[in-house]
């Protein structure tokens, strides 16, 4: 079967360009409606807590790339810092409860902002996708756009040939509405290429923007710090830099 060359200019390219431009426009809209609240979702003390826990995890996982002296210095600093809870947020909540207690999520402003941003993100994702799906179904229904260059099993026929009623058609042929779904699920690398982050786009989850790193619950942060300090204390350090000069000379001489 041969396809008209004009299909890629009048069907394939318009759908692809509209999908990319819609994603870019949605990013700017989400920045306008959730930009200020998203940046205030995590207070600085919470970010500091999370960053020190992440630092300890990275040291445990990648300590073999450091020399013994460097690892020992970082280990001593982190163990002392985590044990003494220097960066633990101990401020009281607005309702008077201690930070170590489990907070009421309905009284947490950051939780309310996160839920509102999620609702805005869902709307900003659902409405454009619904409009574009109607546009593709109305103007490009029944078109076969391309043939994939690799073989597929018959189970992909229903996914790739939506709107095409032809049992004998090879499974590799792709319809217009199927190309729309493929674009929705596979445009994240394109957004990364043009400078839009996956988390900022929120294509799959429908969220409005970055909410900051999510660490352990407030009631468990102190326990997590002590557990991480204990792990750092008992870890056996094996560096890949021991006798590296002799190993390099032995390999190349």
From Swiss-Prot:
Keyword vocabulary terms for this entry: Endoplasmic reticulum, Membrane, Transmembrane, Transmembrane helix
GO molecular function terms listed in the Swiss-Prot or TrEMBL record: protein-folding chaperone binding
Annotated GO biological process: phospholipid metabolic process; phospholipid transport; protein folding in endoplasmic reticulum; protein insertion into ER membrane by stop-transfer membrane-anchor sequence
Membrane topology recorded in Swiss-Prot or TrEMBL: Multi-pass membrane protein
Cross-referenced Pfam families: EMC3_TMCO1 (PF01956)
CC terms in the record's Gene Ontology section: EMC complex
Compartments it resides in: Endoplasmic reticulum membrane
Bilayer-spanning residue ranges: 10-30, 126-146, 176-196
Protein family (similarity comment): Belongs to the EMC3 family.
Subunit organization: Component of the ER membrane protein complex (EMC), which is composed of EMC1, EMC2, EMC3, EMC4, EMC5 and EMC6.
PANTHER family in the cross-refs: ER MEMBRANE PROTEIN COMPLEX SUBUNIT 3
Protein function: Part of the endoplasmic reticulum membrane protein complex (EMC) that enables the energy-independent insertion into endoplasmic reticulum membranes of newly synthesized membrane proteins. Preferentially accommodates proteins with transmembrane domains that are weakly hydrophobic or contain destabilizing features such as charged and aromatic residues. Involved in the cotranslational insertion of multi-pass membrane proteins in which stop-transfer membrane-anchor sequences become ER membrane spanning helices.
Protein name listed in UniProt: ER membrane protein complex subunit 3
Provenance organism: Saccharomyces cerevisiae (strain ATCC 204508 / S288c)
Gene behind the chain: EMC3
